[in-house]
């Protein structure tokens, strides 16, 4: 491959930054509001924080499934818009809405059916089981709105509109704090769930309005809907792209649930410290997710337009930026974490343990950034199967295996040592896949028949 001059590279770096910045700012705003949210719950005591921490991995599991549904359809939207087929993109949107709401309804019923038993299954202390159960119940009721928000946000991002989702998701965080201040004093831990659910409901409907009625590429047309009915090929492609992501999310979140079960016997202080450490770390890695979203959009649209070399270059630029950004935020958090934990909880023992664990995890931030952004770039090409297998092997073999060996002797720091090691392994695996994947060449320019070729290489 020929060398690229900085003069040629500069506008591409600028484009990545312009697309990434709104998403990064949204993620930062989201985490700041989560800090406030955690502090509001933390003021109720360590047991309240532990109750939410106990079921948090289970909420991530259900959220991961909704994310996989969004990925299966949003990548197709990016490809169609990149190829100049707006009508095709709108057809994908229609199919995505129907499918996503059906899946969300099933997940909602499933969550409601297990909420009372879940804290016991997870090995939670009897003192926190009731609050944990009620919090998870409210989360389950929120799933249809969460799915609607995730789907329409990803559609807008893949159409090139990064600003609208950024503004609305930031607004959701502000509403969350407002609603929490109303509900937490009256309902305690469950009030935090009610506040989040209320904010999500308001913003998800607003996001749907912006996507389905206002976006020039995606707004739905009744005549188009009547003319173009059900297309099984769209669902087939969504399944081939989204199913590996869904299986990955389920297996990875299941591993995180197992990790929670490993931590739970350590007591409420360790559970609360782990929950706060995860919240604090998210300020470092959420910007990586913002750049990863930009990578999916830029790679997907250029692959759809047949510009495969440019697509891969954008992916590489995003990976370097993501790793660099997260290295900086990780270094800052290394020094600032005592201040952060003093805001989140008044419990000194929780603060000390959370800071000790977090500093171990921060050592892996640059390679964690590589894994996040590389996954976004590969998703833009439709390459989801092999990255999912790599992620699954990494978290189950490395993280859980090391955790079982280390937690008994070292407690919570042992769990975070296992996690940091696994994140480094995952970053190296994803970097290797970005370098060797054939998916950038699978999608040939302009031909409709080339689209299935993108999805036939799950084995490659």
Regions found by a protein language model. Name each.
Residues 18-37, 138, 149, 199-203, ...:
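Transmembrane helical elements of multi-pass membrane transporters/channels
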Residues 27-31, 64, 104, 108, ...:
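Residue-level hotspots within the lipid-embedded alpha helices of multi-pass solute transporters
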Residues 70, 138-157, 165-176, 192-208, ...:
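Short runs within selected transmembrane alpha-helices of multi-pass transporters and secretion channels
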Residues 32-50, 119-126, 182-187, 250-283, ...:
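Helix-terminus/linker motif at the lipid-water interface of multi-pass membrane proteins
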Residues 8-39, 43-44, 60-72, 76, ...:
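N-terminal transmembrane alpha-helices
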Residues 49-109, 146-165, 260, 273-337, ...:
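Small-residue-rich hydrophobic transmembrane alpha-helices
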Residues 35-39, 117, 147, 151-155, ...:
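Alpha-helical transmembrane segments of multipass membrane proteins
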